[in-house]
Amino acid sequence: CVDWMQGESDEDWSGLREGMYESRMRQYQRQITSDIIARTGQNEPPIIAITQLGYVNDGHTAFTGQYARLSATKLHNHGQFRCVNTLYQYDFISDGLHLTCAGQNRRGAAVARAIIQEWFTSGWYGMVPTGFVWNSPTQIQINVPAYTNLVLDTTTINTSGLANYGFSYTDETGAPPAISSIAISSDGKGVLINLASAPTGRFGRVSYATVENALQSGATVKPSGRTLGARGCVRSSAGITWAYDTSVTLYDWLPAFRINVF
């Protein structure tokens, strides 16, 4: 397995365009697979376990930039890529880039859990959205695979300054209908996005966990993580016990994404 967490500098590169990072990762997959098999003689290619970045360039918004960060969801289950974790639910140090020691340890536990399921059970499929449906002219359902039901967690995630549990909607009009409410579907496998009115513009888009709080007084960088970073509130209803503190449960969290809904 290759434990992959990288891309902060790519996020800051003004020349990065949509699709470029994924192309480079596919090239990397070919190269690293060839190198590892040549050295180990193993029969199966290694899994590339991607942890989605928590860092967001301060100039990026819900629907602009973040191409390296969002590549984790686009690459998931293509070839050897698996999106196994996201970072926004953890605590970061003051530079807004790096996890605390506890956060890094919890990240490692999440990666290990995904790899064990990939190799020794029915495989890891994570919580990357698989599609959407319009249940009505004002309700979008985002379908999310999960081992357990989905829940909205407003305890782990600080909701001060966070609208709609992390979800955003836009279209070509420049004045899209507002999101009126967010809920979990009755079967626990989808997120219901309710709009205040039916959209009149084309190219509707939904994003999740892509908006940070404003720069805090006295700070020089925007933070990452569960308190002020680009984050959301959707997680699994069950998880695993953290080995270093059995009172802590480590859940699966919905990774940041954008999806075109018409």
PLM region spans:
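Cell-envelope and extracellular/periplasmic
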Residues: 1-262
